[in-house]
Every structure is written in C-alpha cells, then in structure tokens.
C-alpha cells in the first residue's frame, strides 16, 4: 500500500515493465518502486492539474496536464521529456478538461474532453485527426480490438461504444443495465485477456448514503457479473486500476 499525501488524488495508475508503479496525483506524477523509493517526481505548475499518467507503447510515459493551454508530454524511461503537444481545449477550468489520456495503436493520443462532451484524436505533432461529439462526459477511453472506442462516461452513470470511423454510438450500457449491480460514476474500464471488462465504479459523487455498490465490477461478453470487489472499509474509492498478469513482487529484503 502506497499512501497519497493530503490533497492528492490519483486518477491514473500503471505498472511498468520493470515493475515500478506510475501514478498521477493532481499536482504531478510519480514513478515509485515497491518499497516506496521515488524514481522521479514530475511536478506541474500552479493553476494546472496533472490528471493523467499512462504508459506509451515504447515503455515511456504520457502525461496529460490540464490547463490553458493543455499539455501532453512524453517522457522516456528515465523521465526525460522527448515530445510535447500544447492544445487549447476551450475549457477555462482545468478540473473540467479531462482525466485519462491514452496513446492509440497508431501512436496518436485520444483525449476525452469532459466539459465539451467530445473526444479528440490528436497526432504527436498536435494535429487534430478526428473529433467525436458524444452524449456523455467521458472520463477515460479504451481502444477495442476492432478499433472502435469504449468510453466510460463518469457521472452519466454509463459507458458507450462509438464507431471509430463515423463517431456513431453503437452501444450504451446504462446504470441499471447490468443485473445485480448499479453503475455510479463510471471511471476507467479495462479489457482483460479473456475479453471481460473490468469497471471502476467510483462512488465519490454519490449523494444518497444508502447506495452501496461494488467498487470494481468484472463482466463477461454477455454483460453478466463474474466478479466484484465490494470492500469500502479497506479499499475506498476506485476511479482507476491496472490489470497485472503473471507478476511477481520483487524481493524487497
């Protein structure tokens, strides 16, 4: 367990090939070892928020900094800046801009702009390749095997799938569509090796104290729940997750 400091919030977490932990904490992003040693700490200036820290295909890191303008910065494995894109998202309040930014298989960036209810595909040189208007404030994104985009829509209590070529909405799963659970704030959604989806069901904006739902929900291809984590006492709110397969903890002795 690695504790966040007071005032920090983590909306992105990943495990590197070396077994180090990458996470964002709003005022920056850190890469730490399993025994809490800081490899690097990238701090962001005042009036900005570093909400996204995700892995690139080459093992580097993509940072997403909310601000005017927004910044998307690539770091190499040693934490050195190797590419930077600045973009005016036309959203003055940094906290309303985005949460998770991922690199697509074609090396472009996918940027869900919450306040504008749209998703941008942007090249590494800062050119807008595609723009999708959606019905929902997307927290994150998942590039599916067929190239289409799955978008978790936060406080809209749903996730959608859109056609990558046309932007058409192909599927929408609403709050009560999954038998046995209810979707609250839909955070990151991951696809596991078996094709199942793992949904982060964040409850931070839930106003009704009687609402009690799992923090993590795994569903199969038919939309049936096959596993869930329901332990608010020991775990708390979950907006982001990292799927670890065949990983062994390093010897810390």
Report the location of each language-model feature.
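Histidine-/acidic-rich catalytic cores in large beta-rich domains
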Residues: 1-253
């Amino acid at each position: 367990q690695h504790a966040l400091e007071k005032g920090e919030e983590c909306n992105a977490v990943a495990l590197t090939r070396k077994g180090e932990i990458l996470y964002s904490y709003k005022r920056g992003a850190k890469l730490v070892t399993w025994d809490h040693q800081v490899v690097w700490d990238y701090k962001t200036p005042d009036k900005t928020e570093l909400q996204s820290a995700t892995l690139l295909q080459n093992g580097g890191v993509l940072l997403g900094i909310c601000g005017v303008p927004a910044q998307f910065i690539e770091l190499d494995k040693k934490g050195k800046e190797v590419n930077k894109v600045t973009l005016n998202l036309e959203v003055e309040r940094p906290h309303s801009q985005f949460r998770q930014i991922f690199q697509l298989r074609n090396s472009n960036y996918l940027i869900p702009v919450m306040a504008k209810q749209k998703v941008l595909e942007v090249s590494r040189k800062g050119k807008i390749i595609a723009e999708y208007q959606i019905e929902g404030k997307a927290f994150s994104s998942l590039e599916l095997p067929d190239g289409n985009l799955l978008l978790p829509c936060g406080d809209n209590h749903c996730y959608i799938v859109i056609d990558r070529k046309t932007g058409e909405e192909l599927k929408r799963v609403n709050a009560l569509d999954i038998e046995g659970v209810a979707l609250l704030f839909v955070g990151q959604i991951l696809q596991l090796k078996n094709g199942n989806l793992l949904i982060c069901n964040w409850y931070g904006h839930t106003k009704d104290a009687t609402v009690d739902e799992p923090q993590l929900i795994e569903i199969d291809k038919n939309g049936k729940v096959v596993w869930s984590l329901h332990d608010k006492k020991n775990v708390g709110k979950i907006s982001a997750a990292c799927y670890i397969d065949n990983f062994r903890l390093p010897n810390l002795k």
